[in-house]
Structures are given as C-alpha cells and as structure tokens.
C-alpha cells in the first residue's frame, strides 16, 4: 500500500499547485510593487515608476562616481579643460529648473581619450570623456552634451531603470523558482 505521505510528495498535484500559487503570488507582488511606485516628475510632468527616493538616487550616484571615473581613466589632468566642463555645467544649472532640484550635480572631464562618451549617474554626477570633449568645437556643443546628461538625471531615468529591473527580477525569480521546482520533482 502506498502511504499518503508519498502520494502528496513534491511531484503531486497538490505540491505543484502550491508552487504555482507561490510563483503567481511572487509575480503579482512584483507587479503591484512596480505599479504602486508611480509618481509625477516635478520637472518633466511625466508619470514615472521609480522605486528609489531622490535621496537614495543621490547616495547611489555619489557612491558609484569614484569607481565609474576610475573605469574611464580618472579625472583629466588638464585644469583648463576641467574648468570649462564645470563652468558650462554650472551655467546650465543656473539657467534651468535643473538648478533648483535637490540633485548634487558635479561635472567631470575624464582622462579616457579612446572612448567617445558622456554619461550621468543617478543623483547628479555628470561625466564626459576627453575623447568626446576633444571632438567638440564650441561651448554650445559642450552645453548640448552636458544638458542632455542633466536631462537624464532630472528625468530620473536611472531610477526608472532600477524599478523596471526589480519588476523583471521578481517575474524571472518566480519563473526560475517554478522551473527549479519542476526539475527537482522530476529527479525523485
């Protein structure tokens, strides 16, 4: 006679149903957390899904800035060029709403002369590589690049990306958990 314990084992319909319910709960919880994180961006006026506070964004950017700078050769050694980048960035802040935000903007010219790039971290650190800087011909072009990066910060693009990652991880976690349950039950 088969014991009732064996009939209700991992591979049984009851065990499988419970695992499906757990996976479904994980998915629903992830979607609800994502949807409940909506807010209206004060600068852009757009509805966004962000899971970080502005303070958390600033802390994340300040924490990540040294490592990111190091990956691109650190700050450029030319004080005149470094000063121009900072001055143009500050002019943009002084003449736009971005300067009235709580973000901790900083503007750094990086020494990397091979990678043509500019980027912003959450909370305000803005970087431009010397490879891109050296290709710009006017202060207006530099302002365009820095303004674009400032726009990413005030539009909270990094915070939106992190919220989407959390949603994706929650859904993927449920799928992986469900798949591993299937694999484990097939080995018994």
Report the location of each language-model feature.
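Single conserved hydrophobic/aromatic residue that forms the stacking wall/gate
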Residues: 183-188
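A Zn2+-metalloprotease active-site environment signal
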Residues: 1-182
